[in-house]
């Protein structure tokens, strides 16, 4: 089973920037990374209204596979069940990965000891709310909070600024993965 790192936090707290930073730098170090993002918008679709793939699905296809020279996309039209961690990880079963990074999914990962976590927050209150009910391991807190409380910690968890201290966060992740 793969190592799993979850980046959890409220909307606009810095989750995607954190994922982007980590994926970029972990790949540079030679690691193979998979990622999954929770989308909480009920009307979200990756497909575009009127495009050919949309037309396939609109006609009733349960699964639409798009293939080009450089990319494969699989669109499954289904009402999502109450996803579990294993359901998400099963989506990666056809390949080997050094690390799976999850963005969001707090309700799935917050009480899982086997999932490494990084919390993103806007401010101290936001961080404390997210930390409440989230069990270790929690490597760090990052995101917009680092503009306010850079170099500090909350509940002995370091607050790391990605711009100036990103290497520190990367090292913490590498120690857990390797």
Name each region found by the language model:
Residues 4:
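Walker A (P-loop) ATP-phosphate-binding motif of ABC ATPase nucleotide-binding domains
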Residues 7:
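Hydrophobic anchor at the beta1->P-loop junction of P-loop NTPases
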Residues 10:
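P-loop (Walker A) phosphate-binding loop of NTP-binding proteins
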Residues 15:
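Conserved lysine of the Walker
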Residues 18-19:
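Post-Walker A alpha-helix
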Residues 23-80:
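N-terminal phosphate/diphosphate-binding loop that engages ATP/GTP or pyrophosphate donors
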Residues 76-107:
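Phosphate-binding/switch loop-helix module in NTP-utilizing enzymes
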Residues 99-158, 163-177:
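Phosphate/Mg2+-binding loops and adjacent switch elements
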